[in-house]
Amino acid sequence: MEPGRRGAAALLALLCVACALRAGRAQYERYSFRSFPRDELMPLESAYRHALDKYSGEHWAESVGYLEISLRLHRLLRDSEAFCHRNCSAAPQPEPAAGLASYPELRLFGGLLRRAHCLKRCKQGLPAFRQSQPSREVLADFQRREPYKFLQFAYFKANNLPKAIAAAHTFLLKHPDDEMMKRNMAYYKSLPGAEDYIKDLETKSYESLFIRAVRAYNGENWRTSITDMELALPDFFKAFYECLAACEGSREIKDFKDFYLSIADHYVEVLECKIQCEENLTPVIGGYPVEKFVATMYHYLQFAYYKLNDLKNAAPCAVSYLLFDQNDKVMQQNLVYYQYHRDTWGLSDEHFQPRPEAVQFFNVTTLQKELYDFAKENIMDDDEGEVVEYVDDLLELEETS
């Protein structure tokens, strides 16, 4: 949007519209994973491409309609992936056949085949997988919130300023340095009542809970802060593991490679998606992402529990925090304090163990990063190293190494 191209009369008209318009229906209001509207079921990529075609032709209402549908279809696909992977992960694994203990490779691939069978059966029953699957480029657009860039301008041209403001804000949270959108938002903020419509259309419930918990914390309402923060933690972990599951969706295989290299390439691509989940799910508050979000939640919790003299809950939160920031001097001192008063407060060794969900999250993210770094250094195509042409050269390299 280029505000400089409009005259004073147009600006006056827009100000009147801003006063008169109410916030419209959110694009996810009709969304339901269990009962998605049949009239909206279509391939995600087709809906998105059609929306962009209508956008290019300046058919704003149709563009808005199909952009909103494509956002719902994308959420349906992600939720469907997460649903199947979550259920198949929880499915009990049969005991290996007698004698297989000596064949770890067969056991490994046996588990993979059973998992594939479970996923195939699950996906056959879900409407999201009865459509042709989108390309990785389209999925990347949705991950980057690109549809909101187009929605913002289409809403504006359709005289729906409340939604245009929300779409601009939603896009800016992922692209805080986008100059055009920053200018658009500056213009919107100059309109009366604009602040009422500045909202993240992709916000997660744990973000609202976290903000409420911090506000209660700052107001020294310790119990309220603890209640909301203890709700935010599992809600974030749920979103995180669903994000991991969604990364295991369909992939386009183009290269012709050896069996193990092909599997490794596929898994590295999945890992690349998974290691971005934590960053992508981190709340952005005041234009800045919350640094070390999971650790920060444990930091707030340990102090709030301490203020209520509940050291049996404060100590595990302190130890959990130190998983993510081992060199934090303040938290180390807190832990020394808790250890010193352990008899007074009836603390045992189990109170100085990190919470199980923190250990699981730490282990998963750490191992994923280690695997990805190994693959990046040793397997990925950018780092193929020296090409060996003859067996003698290979033997010589092995001897020198």
Swiss-Prot record:
Keywords, comma-separated and alphabetical: Disease variant, Dwarfism, Extracellular matrix, Glycoprotein, Hydroxylation, Osteogenesis imperfecta, Secreted, Signal
Tissue specificity field: Found in articular chondrocytes. Expressed in a variety of tissues.
GO cellular component: endoplasmic reticulum; endoplasmic reticulum lumen; extracellular space; protein-containing complex
Positions bearing carbohydrate: N87, N363
UniProt main location, coarse: secreted
Organism superkingdom: Eukaryota
Tagged with keyword Cytoplasm: no
GO terms (BP aspect): chaperone-mediated protein folding; collagen fibril organization; negative regulation of post-translational protein modification; protein stabilization; spermatogenesis
Subcellular location: Secreted, Extracellular space, Extracellular matrix
Secretion signal, residue range per the UniProt entry: 1-26
Keyword Ubl conjugation among UniProt keywords: no
Disorder named in the UniProt entry: Osteogenesis imperfecta 7: A form of osteogenesis imperfecta, a disorder of bone formation characterized by low bone mass, bone fragility and susceptibility to fractures after minimal trauma. Disease severity ranges from very mild forms without fractures to intrauterine fractures and perinatal lethality. Extraskeletal manifestations, which affect a variable number of patients, are dentinogenesis imperfecta, hearing loss, and blue sclerae. OI7 is an autosomal recessive, severe form.
Summary of the function given for this chain in its UniProt record: Necessary for efficient 3-hydroxylation of fibrillar collagen prolyl residues.
Protein family membership: Belongs to the leprecan family.
Protein name, entry field: Cartilage-associated protein
Gene source species: Homo sapiens
Lineage: Eukaryota, Metazoa, Chordata, Craniata, Vertebrata
